[in-house]
Amino acid sequence: MTIAKDYRTIYRNQIKKQIRLNQEHLQSLTHLGSQINFEVDPPKLPDPDPARKVFFFDIDNTLYRKSTKVQLLMQQSLSNFFKYELGFDDDEAERLIESYYQEYGLSVKGLIKNKQIDDVLQYNTFIDDSLPLQDYLKPDWKLRELLINLKKKKLGKFDKLWLFTNSYKNHAIRCVKILGIADLFDGITYCHYDRPIEEEFICKPDPKFFETAKLQSGLSSFANAWFIDDNESNVRSALSMGMGHVIHLIEDYQYESENIVTKDHKNKQQFSILKDILEIPLIMDVEVYRPSSIAIKEMEELEEEGEAVNWSNQQINVQSS
């Protein structure tokens, strides 16, 4: 046995062991919100309702904080896969991971496009299914309270809370179960790692994936949707699709004078920048102020990218609650 094959065998055995531990943990969950109440793959699409309001939630680095370090765990998992399964050295693995993410929105899409893998579901097993999420995430009761209130009149009275993720369903559902919020969502739009390699693989920020989420949730008009994501490309795509309120979650964002930036976009859309998902109640009702230098910079950057921007700038004080 060569050294390379020996390392690969050790790597695969470690993956198998961790997946077994992950499955045992998932099956042991009994806390509030650890079970889903929706059908993951319903047999038919719901009828669109013109009055329906839907809030779309990204999962990774959104429903849990980036500072949990799950992203670093994912990056290490990706790096190991590129090294031990695909045979790249550390530098080349790092370069390809970043390059594919920037160009395609997901590293796996780059691997598919460049014919470097032939089994996407196996890739998912090595990457997301093997993550020891239970060592990094725990039930978030404040987040649970927020989600419950979003369906109440005082916080927008959304008809549906919808998971919208570039991950496969296994990882997505495991995350929300551990967080204790699985029972609060009405459905999920996820990337189909389980489809044949020759089929088109779509993910955010592809507009077709947004249309898929619209159909699956029964949303009639994007104007009736709210969307939150930590990825700038996904946020820009949501704005271009006409979503009613788009939130860019930037955990290390520096508010100017402790103000949250909320701005009116074209076609009565609104765009907000938040540091924490728990700040959502603060942008439900906003008062108009003069634009901050940060807001102006954001507008200029969007205009340079070709966005048709017609803002009236709004901010609210973080301490107002």
From Swiss-Prot:
CDD domains: HAD_5NT. Signal peptide: none annotated. It holds the Pfam family Hydrolase. Belongs to the SSM1 family. It comes from Saccharomyces cerevisiae (strain ATCC 204508 / S288c) (Baker's yeast). One of its GO terms (cellular component) is nucleus. InterPro entries: HAD-like_sf, HAD-SF_hydro_IA, HAD_sf, Pyr-5-nucltdase, SSM1_domain. This is Phosphate metabolism protein 8. One of its GO terms (molecular function) is nucleotidase activity. It comes from the Eukaryota. Present with 195 molecules/cell in log phase SD medium. Induction: By low phosphate level. GO terms for biological process: cellular response to phosphate starvation; nucleotide catabolic process; pyrimidine nucleobase metabolic process; response to carbon starvation; triglyceride homeostasis. May be involved in phosphate metabolism.
